[in-house]
Amino acid sequence: MCILKISRIWNKILYDVSFLLKKEPILSDFYQSSILQHQSFTSSLSYILSNKLSTSMISEKKIQGIFDDVYLNDRSILNFIVQDIKAVLKRDPAVNDYLTPLLYLKGFHALEAYRISHYLWNTGKKSLSLYLQSRISSEFSVDIHPAAFIGSGVMLDHATGIVIGEGVTIENDVSILHSVTLGGTGKNFSQNRHPTIRKGVVIGAGAKILGNIEVGSGAKIGAGSIVLKNVPSDVTVVGVPAKIVSQVSSKKYYSQKKKNSLKYINIFQHGDGI
């Protein structure tokens, strides 16, 4: 079923590119190399990411080979890719097609590159995993430790300055704005020093969630807030330190159409960073 879904997304991307070739012919070489020369979505994605992450020391071809091997050996990653790109289309008001995140959105790029580094970390290739983490951080200004776990349907919006620590767990359908830190307090040096973010959480720009705490499902974290204690499900917290200011309905959030549900993302976008 996942293969069918990603094939449909790929066919839609090919259709959109065929239209844009006529509208923006100056980009024809770009579309050809990034999209049209490839036989599948994952081939295109691995090309785009390897082009950005390669250096004079490790070539684009070698990086692309790593990505292609992972996609071949762990087909479950395809489901994460599908759900991630669908999340961007559903929640980002600036995105109306699958082509945009594939080509242009560094939050999507950083997340999918992290998924490769996470696979490498879990299969014992830690040095290679850390190399990719370093390149992802340098290229996208997004620092995600490869040991962190990130579920599917996650959106990193704008993405600049996001930091996600080693022991972080992020469940499905979470939205994270720019300049967010999910880290430790500096007082605990165990592996259990980082937060757990439950399903459907929205974390506003510049928020810091620190320590071995839990943010409950459907909670909303206001921009610039500092969270040092557990947050119950379906509440909004704001401030320094963060305090509960209202109840929210996660069921309502997920049942509404894009134009309505996006207001929950939009009100948390303000803060430092771009």
Curated annotation (Swiss-Prot):
Alphabetized, the UniProt keywords read: Acyltransferase, Amino-acid biosynthesis, Cysteine biosynthesis, Cytoplasm, Repeat, Transferase
Decide whether keyword Iron is in the record.
no
Top-level lineage group: Bacteria
Q: Where in the cell is it found?
A: Cytoplasm
Q: Which Gene3D superfamilies match?
A: Hexapeptide repeat proteins, serine acetyltransferase, domain 1
Q: Which GO terms describe its biological process?
A: cysteine biosynthetic process from serine
State the name under which the record lists this protein. Serine acetyltransferase
> What's the gene?
cysE
